[in-house]
Swiss-Prot record:
<feature type="binding site">
    <location>
        <position position="220"/>
    </location>
    <ligand>
        <name>[4Fe-4S] cluster</name>
    </ligand>
</feature>
<dbReference type="GO" id="GO:0016783">
    <property type="term" value="F:sulfurtransferase activity"/>
</dbReference>
<keyword id="KW-0460">Magnesium</keyword>
<dbReference type="GO" id="GO:0005737">
    <property type="term" value="C:cytoplasm"/>
</dbReference>
<dbReference type="GO" id="GO:0034227">
    <property type="term" value="P:tRNA thio-modification"/>
</dbReference>
<keyword id="KW-0820">tRNA-binding</keyword>
<keyword id="KW-0808">Transferase</keyword>
<keyword id="KW-0819">tRNA processing</keyword>
<comment type="similarity">
    <text>Belongs to the TtcA family.</text>
</comment>
<keyword id="KW-0479">Metal-binding</keyword>
<dbReference type="InterPro" id="IPR014729">
    <property type="entry name" value="Rossmann-like_a/b/a_fold"/>
</dbReference>
<dbReference type="GO" id="GO:0000287">
    <property type="term" value="F:magnesium ion binding"/>
</dbReference>
<feature type="binding site">
    <location>
        <position position="129"/>
    </location>
    <ligand>
        <name>[4Fe-4S] cluster</name>
    </ligand>
</feature>
<comment type="subunit">
    <text>Homodimer.</text>
</comment>
<keyword id="KW-0004">4Fe-4S</keyword>
<feature type="short sequence motif" description="PP-loop motif">
    <location>
        <begin position="54"/>
        <end position="59"/>
    </location>
</feature>
<keyword id="KW-0408">Iron</keyword>
């Protein structure tokens, strides 16, 4: 009788541990993505989801997770991966098609030489990202219409949401972030961000575990957005020195109290008058300025935002 060694027996303890941690991470990412999809009704029965694949870690992870969830979703929906080849110098045109064929997922490669347009318009050494992003967005909206996609899925994660919020706060004077779901300016497309609850550190680890064929994001040679980089460093520093702080700021984006801010469009301060009816949460005129304690730590993203816990079981989409 011939004995065959099992695959598990061939692994070293270090490899077995890495595999265990990777599988645990995959389950956590699937859980957080499912929660975001359910909380914001991102994907519905019959949807055709266009996953925008750039070749970076975030979009690879998004496609991988959605394909996994599609197999056990309680309803049917389609996925099509789309990459925009902008003719950046050195871009390897074969990597994504080969990867997607191996996955067996429907895909479309859209080739548009936006690189030449951007380099012609933007002076050398200046940041090209803003114009490039606008051109890319318009092309992807057109492709979504041509493909009959009902949802456009982007790979922005928790740190992107926080970074955009702080950029608008510090440099734009606005409390404005990056929503998990929006309708495009022309009113024709729904854009979703299923990784909204996922920190970037998890996506870095997941890319290493899955060995995605990452395509560098600096092929265009554009100057990196220094303000965004600075904000990113600030968030990373918080995570090191003050665990839980960045999660508390993130949670605050879904715990807005308009009556305790200053936006007259959100709350009628001008018409505010006594009603004779007690408001337990309304009188803070003589309170201390100390914030309410929040005992949630780095894992508080797994808790439903305040006010949404009741009845959540009835609304939640369950992927078995």
């Amino acid at each position: 009788m011939t004995l065959t060694a099992s695959p598990t027996a061939a692994r070293t303890p270090a490899e077995e541990k890495a595999r265990f941690e990777g599988n645990k991470l995959a389950k956590r990412l699937a859980r957080e993505t499912t929660r975001a999809i359910a909380d914001y009704n991102m994907i519905e029965a019959g949807d055709k989801v266009m996953v925008c694949l750039s070749g970076g870690k975030d979009s690879y992870a998004l496609l991988d997770i959605l394909l996994s969830l599609q197999k056990r979703a309680p309803f049917a929906f389609e996925i099509i991966a789309v990459n925009l080849d902008q003719k950046q110098p050195g871009f390897p045109p074969e990597i994504l098609p080969d990867y997607l064929r191996a996955l067996g997922v429907p895909f479309h490669i859209e080739t548009q030489d936006t690189y030449s347009i951007v380099t012609r318009v933007i002076p050398e050494g200046k940041t090209m990202c803003s114009l490039c992003s606008r051109l890319r967005r318009g092309i992807l909206y057109r492709v979504a219409s041509e493909l009959g996609a009902t949802k456009i899925a982007l790979g922005h994660h928790r740190d992107d949401i926080l970074g955009t919020f702080f950029l608008n706060l510090f440099y734009g004077g606005k409390a404005k972030g990056m929503p998990p779901k929006l309708v495009s300016d022309d009113g024709r497309h729904t854009v979703i961000r299923p990784l909204v609850y996922v920190p970037e550190s998890d996506l870095i680890a997941y890319a290493q575990f899955k060995q995605f064929p990452i395509i560098p994001c600096n092929l265009c040679g554009s100057q990196e957005n220094l303000k965004r980089k600075e904000v990113g460093r600030m968030i990373q520093e918080w995570d090191r020195k003050h665990p839980g702080r960045s999660w508390n700021v993130f949670n605050a984006l879904s715990r807005v109290v308009p009556s305790h801010l200053m936006d007259r469009d959100l709350f009628d301060f001008v018409g505010l008058k006594p009603t004779g009816v007690a408001d337990a949460g309304g009188d803070t005129a003589f309170d201390q300025i100390d914030p309410e304690p929040d005992t949630a730590g780095p894992g508080c993203a797994s808790d439903a935002p305040a006010g949404q816990a009741d009845g959540m079981a009835e609304q939640r989409v369950v992927f078995r």
